[in-house]
UniProtKB/Swiss-Prot annotation:
One of its GO terms (cellular component) is cytosol. NCBIfam families: PRK00977.1-1, PRK00977.1-4, xseB. GO terms for molecular function: exodeoxyribonuclease VII activity. This is Exodeoxyribonuclease 7 small subunit. Heterooligomer composed of large and small subunits. Its EC number is 3.1.11.6. Keywords: Cytoplasm, Exonuclease, Hydrolase, Nuclease. SUPFAM superfamilies: XseB-like. Bidirectionally degrades single-stranded DNA into large acid-insoluble oligonucleotides, which are then degraded further into small acid-soluble oligonucleotides. It catalyses: Exonucleolytic cleavage in either 5'- to 3'- or 3'- to 5'-direction to yield nucleoside 5'-phosphates. The gene is xseB. It is found in: Cytoplasm. Belongs to the XseB family. One of its GO terms (biological process) is DNA catabolic process.
Length: 80
């Protein structure tokens, strides 16, 4: 299986893989080279996850700040 670049993964997949890597590293049964490789992958995943989270927070902030003064209207489906 090809390893996906962290920036091409969903936030959830990034966190899931990062959690798995942390478990493996905490277990302590890895050879030094394997542990270092997994640590490097974990750092890349953590950075990508932080970027995705920051982007999402920024989008939410923009959406909440857009047109605060707009009146609220009842929802009317197109089928009416």
């Amino acid at each position: 299986m090809a390893v996906k670049k962290p920036e091409n993964m969903t936030f959830e997949a990034t966190i899931e893989e990062l959690d798995s890597l942390v478990d493996q590293l905490e277990n302590g049964d890895l050879a030094l080279d394997d542990a270092l490789r997994k640590f490097e992958r974990g750092i890349a995943l953590a950075r990508a996850g932080q970027t995705k989270l920051s982007d999402a927070e920024q989008r939410v902030s923009i959406l909440l700040s857009e047109d605060d003064e707009a009146p609220l209207n009842d929802f009317k489906p197109d089928s009416e």
